A protein has these predicted regions:
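Ribonuclease/tRNase effector modules and their secretory precursors
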Residues: 1-104
Length: 104
């Protein structure tokens, strides 16, 4: 997944675009997530699932803790000219193990 991580970060250095779904998810009242927090996941986080056959093109699920120490997951897809952030969410214990990297 190291190659995929490099592709994600290289695409993000060019430009990051957000789908409407991602923007809506970032602005859920209980879990408002900033652009800076998303950038933190992209540039300091890790890929925990890889989806090479995704219908939108190769995509992956990334994870990191924000500076506020809350876990954040993003699904993104690296393109030639940009990184598309498809969605994001704050993972919960009912769906993820304590490490927030492993599904229940």
């Amino acid at each position: 997944m190291e190659k995929s991580l490099n592709e994600v970060r290289e695409a993000a250095r060019k430009k990051i675009i957000y789908t409407q779904h991602a923007l809506d998810a970032m602005n859920v009242e209980e879990e408002i997530v900033s652009y800076e927090e998303i950038r933190n996941v992209i540039f300091k986080g890790e890929i925990i699932e890889d989806y090479p056959e995704d219908k939108r093109g190769h995509s992956c699920l990334m994870f990191n803790y924000t500076l506020k120490q809350r876990p954040v997951h993003i699904v993104c897809s690296p393109k030639q000219e940009f990184l598309a952030v498809i969605t994001m969410y704050v993972p919960t214990i009912d769906k993820w193990k304590d490490d927030f990297r492993t599904r229940r």
